[in-house]
Amino acid sequence: MPRSFLVKSKKAHSYHQPRSPGPDYSLRLENVPAPSRADSTSNAGGAKAEPRDRLSPESQLTEAPDRASASPDSCEGSVCERSSEFEDFWRPPSPSASPASEKSMCPSLDEAQPFPLPFKPYSWSGLAGSDLRHLVQSYRPCGALERGAGLGLFCEPAPEPGHPAALYGPKRAAGGAGAGAPGSCSAGAGATAGPGLGLYGDFGSAAAGLYERPTAAAGLLYPERGHGLHADKGAGVKVESELLCTRLLLGGGSYKCIKCSKVFSTPHGLEVHVRRSHSGTRPFACEMCGKTFGHAVSLEQHKAVHSQERSFDCKICGKSFKRSSTLSTHLLIHSDTRPYPCQYCGKRFHQKSDMKKHTFIHTGEKPHKCQVCGKAFSQSSNLITHSRKHTGFKPFGCDLCGKGFQRKVDLRRHRETQHGLK
């Protein structure tokens, strides 16, 4: 179709609509100067333009329709929609265009160079309040960000009052299993509700396992965890009355027994101490003498007593021992080192355990009790010797006559009196 049919004459709509009091945006002659910024500002403010002479060249130009309502600060029609008045601006050049003799009145239309398109400005007042809510989301301030700095917390946007997320939470509204309060803080996809728990919501199974899956050692060290949030998950943990130990912060993170106030550097040492000394649980028993131990390593070391092999020899006196710990204690005799004195009588001992056993003489304490007859002893060695009376076990035998004895001192006396050996 020739371009001449696309250009509208001034008779088509020049007398149907009044002149625009504002600046004319559709002047199509390049020699006509564009209105200045000051003029457009004054006209937009409501000032009337000067009347034009009908015989002036400007009156012969094609006049655009009234665009007073389409000022740069308003948009009453459709939002950013192309108007029908600019149809010839939008239409691309056709391959079968008219010849040069049929060019339009405006030479700028025939040029291939780009030119500014008269878009209508975007108007916020033309939209309803519900249409603007999805464009601008209100984020509520999160107080937990100050408390949990560095924990990766973030705030979720608060949904609309009628949105399903406001009633069921963002996850259930989307089809998920979890639900969260609108505008609440979360730490990932699986944040839980409640103070303190949200800060540890979804930081991996390792961090959550420290609080939800207490082990046997954790149950011994922290008996109060059996009551509270995870009481149902700590059914296998002993009751607090049987644990007799807790952790006490002593500078370097030491562990203190609440029964005897003994301090340990590791939780494992405290656990072994409670099992051996206070709980009465000694599950490892010797097959030869029946002595029980609280740890498997202690039982293996004890089995060396029943063997005749003495592989640890003293280089000073030549005396041999079955265990290296016994040799270390023996070496203190040659050095005459007794660093552990008794607080009652001042007697000094090579080992701390010997000093502790000695103090029972002054205090009268007898912590070792026989399970058969109920007799109590101040030292564990005396209880072991006493228990052989009930079992009939005689570990010390004479190599000359084969007679057995329950105590080593009885064997030595037998050798001196019956065989004349010293």
Swiss-Prot record:
Q: Name one Pfam family in it.
A: zf-C2H2
Q: Which region ranges are annotated with the description Required for interaction with RELA? A: 140-257
Q: Which GO terms describe its cellular component?
A: nuclear body; nuclear matrix; nucleus; transcription repressor complex
Task: Consult the record and explain the modifications the protein receives after translation.
Answer: Ubiquitinated. Ubiquitination and degradation by the proteasome is inhibited by the ubiquitin ligase, ARIH2.
Q: Where in the cell is it found?
A: Nucleus
Q: Where is this region: Disordered?
A: 1-109
Record's keyword terms, sorted: Disease variant, DNA-binding, Metal-binding, Nucleus, Phosphoprotein, Repeat, Transcription, Transcription regulation, Ubl conjugation, Zinc, Zinc-finger
Q: Main subcellular localization, coarse class?
A: nucleus
Q: Which residues fall in a coiled-coil region?
A: none
Q: Which residues carry this modification: Phosphoserine?
A: 20, 56
An example of a GO molecular function for this protein is: transcription cis-regulatory region binding
Q: Where are the zinc fingers (C2H2-type)?
A: 255-278, 284-306, 312-334, 340-362, 368-390, 396-419
Query: What domain of life?
Result: Eukaryota
Which function does this protein serve? Answer: Transcription repressor essential for hematopoiesis. Functions in a cell-context and development-specific manner. Binds to 5'-TAAATCAC[AT]GCA-3' in the promoter region of a large number of genes. Component of several complexes, including the EHMT2-GFI1-HDAC1, AJUBA-GFI1-HDAC1 and RCOR-GFI-KDM1A-HDAC complexes, that suppress, via histone deacetylase (HDAC) recruitment, a number of genes implicated in multilineage blood cell development. Regulates neutrophil differentiation, promotes proliferation of lymphoid cells, and is required for granulocyte development.
Q: What is this protein called?
A: Zinc finger protein Gfi-1
Q: Which gene encodes it?
A: GFI1
